[in-house]
UniProtKB/Swiss-Prot annotation:
Gene3D superfamilies: Bira Bifunctional Protein, Domain 2, Nucleic acid-binding proteins. Keywords: Aminoacyl-tRNA synthetase, ATP-binding, Cytoplasm, Ligase, Nucleotide-binding, Protein biosynthesis. This is Asparagine--tRNA ligase. Its EC number is 6.1.1.22. The keyword Ligase applies.
Length: 466
């Protein structure tokens, strides 16, 4: 008896006639007048369930098999044979169907064998992975994560685990979750009535990280090429389809690199991940194409086969101003591009991915390298058709005197960045990197409309369930 996954059984990874054991959960059960039950069983390993053919000669047929409903857990043992019906290559002719767990009340079980709204499924996030949509999202997410690690490994990068608890604000925006063990009702105070953070767990104010970039820079300036891939937190009160309070970030950092090399890396990276998902998740993408958003497969294929257009920010603003299109937000130099602007550039002006480069210094972060014009920084955004910005990156400011000016201009506390300044004091070199919200990538590949559906348990303003 060979224990096999549904994926392996359906793909012909086991010789026909082999005695197999398949473990999983019931999707549907159909009974014939001939005294045979056809039970579709899924174990999450692939999109399609496998059909288990259970005859009424099985000893538990009347008592258990005829009472199987969606969600019941079973172990099926029998012979793997070519399927007589349409829709799948193989099925299991059962000698035994062991029922491990019934559903308490099938009528109130949240995941019924029907189509549910995504809004409803967010309220049962602990069960929604049992649906076609979310099991497919999970497989795509897994395959994409594997592709991320494989890409950077093949490119000679080292994976660095940066801290989740930090005293530095990498973005300088102040939208951070505080980490504290002090009594929230009656915290210790200094003589002037302020909270005495010296008595907190870390002896100072601490926060959940908004980015691993600053720490990654330190490692890049010794290891040459590193990347982070981990959870990130933003206390941004944005209740939109594009924002999460907790998400996963991919952040490579490369020593001796400039902005153009950074853009080249971003292009190679995205194409690698898309190729991996297209190659390995075909059944899942077919489902997204048919049931979620038409065109997702073609969009990814075009993305892979396109060269990225590079446009200077100043040029992009001029293009938008001349466009014969009414925008909700008028394009103006010195303001960030809105999603409508980004999509116009990629979908109507160019027709492929765009890298916008050299943004006004006032609208970008303190660590970005100031260009010679004194007005712009060596920053870039990679824009993708259908979604807009998908990657943000920059060449980092490697000159200590300029970095100090930027820290002061942004009103940051210099004492919090002494270690970061050290990187410019001890063998500083030009370096660059970018950041990519992993969930935004999943949204793009799956054709989802809401980023809350791209992560198992979404954390958003007003909600931290499960």
């Amino acid at each position: 008896m060979q224990v096999v996954s549904v994926k392996k059984a359906l793909a012909g990874g086991v010789e026909e006639g082999t005695k197999v054991e398949v473990r999983g959960w019931v999707r549907t059960r159909r009974d014939s007048k001939a005294g045979i039950s056809f039970v579709n069983v899924s174990d999450g390993s692939t999109f399609d369930p496998i059909q288990v053919v259970a005859p009424n000669s099985l000893p538990n047929y009347e008592k258990e098999i005829l009472h199987l409903t969606a969600g019941c857990s079973v172990i099926s043992r029998g012979t793997l044979v070519k399927s007589q019906g349409k829709g799948q290559a193989y099925e299991v002719q059962a000698d035994e169907v062991q029922v491990l767990g019934f559903v308490d009340d099938p009528d109130t079980y949240p995941i019924q064998p029907k189509q549910h709204t995504l809004e409803f499924l967010r309220d049962v996030a602990h069960l929604r992975v049992r649906t076609n949509t979310f099991s497919a999202v999970t497989r795509v997410r897994h395959r994409a994560a594997q592709a991320v690690h494989r890409f950077f490994d093949e490119e000679g990068f080292f994976w660095v685990n940066t801290p989740i608890i930090t005293a530095s604000d990498a973005e300088g925006a102040g939208q951070m979750f505080r980490v504290s063990t002090l009594d929230a009702v009656n915290p210790p105070r200094t003589s002037d009535g302020k909270i005495d953070w010296h008595k907190d767990f870390f002896g100072k104010e601490a926060y959940l990280t908004v980015s691993g970039q600053l720490n990654a820079e330190a490692y890049a300036l010794a290891m040459s090429k590193v990347y982070t891939f981990g959870p990130t937190f933003r206390a941004e009160n944005s209740n939109t389809t594009r924002h999460l309070a907790e998400f996963w970030m991919i952040e490579p950092e490369v020593a001796f690199a400039d902005l153009n090399e950074d853009a080249n890396l971003a292009e190679r990276f995205l194409k690698h991940v898309f190729k991996a998902v297209l190659n390995d998740c075909a059944p899942d993408l077919k489902f997204f194409e048919e049931r979620v958003q038409k065109g997702v497969i073609e969009r990814m294929e075009k993305f892979i086969n396109s060269s990225f257009e590079r446009i200077d920010y100043t040029e992009a603003v001029e293009i938008l101003k001349k466009a014969k299109k009414k925008f909700e937000f008028e394009p103006e130099w010195g303001k960030d591009l809105q999603t409508e602007h980004e999509r116009y550039l990629t979908e109507e002006h160019v027709g492929r991915p765009v890298v916008v480069m050299n943004y006004p210094e006032a609208i970008k972060s303190f660590y970005m390298r100031l260009n010679d014009d004194g007005k712009t920084v060596a920053a870039m955004d990679v824009l993708a058709p259908g979604i807009g910005e998908i990657i943000g990156g920059s060449q980092r400011e490697e000159r200590l005197d300029v970095l100090d000016q930027r820290i002061q201009k942004f009103g940051l506390k210099p004492e919090s960045y002494q270690w970061y300044r050290d990187l410019r004091r001890y063998g500083s070199v030009p370096h660059a990197g970018f950041g990519l919200g992993f969930e935004r990538l999943i949204v793009y590949m799956c054709g989802l409309q809401n980023i809350r559906d791209a992560i198992p348990y979404p954390r958003v303003p007003g909600s931290a369930a499960f």
